């Protein structure tokens, strides 16, 4: 194999690796966004539960809308 052919093979491997890595990162970003959204909803449900109880709402006024 000549140097030119070896260089072309090297560039093809680099290109293939870059494409696979890029698409994997995008899929991972989508999974992270979905997990983050689910966590945000769970936190919101917990805060609403706290705000429904007077004792907890009094302690966490900044979360329950009892601003200063």
UniProtKB/Swiss-Prot annotation:
Q: How is it used?
A: The fluorescent analog of LtIA (LtIA-F) is a highly selective molecule targeting alpha-3-beta-2/CHRNA3-CHRNB2 nAChR that could be used as a molecular probe for the study of the structure, function, and distribution of this receptor in live systems. It displays a ~4-fold decrease in potency towards alpha-3-beta-2/CHRNA3-CHRNB2 compared with native LtIA without a change in selectivity.
Q: Which UniProt keywords apply?
A: Acetylcholine receptor inhibiting toxin, Amidation, Disulfide bond, Ion channel impairing toxin, Neurotoxin, Postsynaptic neurotoxin, Secreted, Signal, Toxin
User: What would changing residue 52 to S do, according to UniProt?
Assistant: 3-fold decrease in ability to block alpha-3-beta-2/CHRNA3-CHRNB2 nAChRs. 2.4-fold decrease in ability to block alpha-3-beta-2/CHRNA3-CHRNB2 nAChRs
Family annotation (Pfam families): Toxin_8
Ser-Xaa-Pro motif, crucial for potent interaction with nAChR: region residues: 52-54
Q: Which domain of life is it from?
A: Eukaryota
As given in the record, the signal peptide range reads 1-21
Q: Please list the residues that carry the modification Cysteine amide.
A: 64
**Which intervals of the chain form a coiled coil?**
none
Q: Where is this region: Lacks the Ser-Xaa-Pro motif that is crucial for potent interaction with nAChR?
A: 52-54
| Job description of the protein | Alpha-conotoxins act on postsynaptic membranes, they bind to the nicotinic acetylcholine receptors (nAChR) and thus inhibit them. This toxin potently and selectively blocks rat alpha-3-beta-2/CHRNA3-CHRNB2 nAChRs (IC(50)=9.8-22.95 nM). Also shows a moderate block on rat alpha-6/alpha-3-beta-2-beta-3 (CHRNA6/CHRNA3-CHRNB2-CHRNB3) nAChRs (IC(50)=84.4 nM), and a weak activity on rat alpha-6/alpha-3-beta-4 (CHRNA6/CHRNA3-CHRNB4) nAChRs (IC(50)~6 uM). The block of alpha-3-beta-2/CHRNA3-CHRNB2 nAChRs is rapidly reversible.
Protein name stated in the entry: Alpha-conotoxin Lt1a
The organism named in the record is Conus litteratus
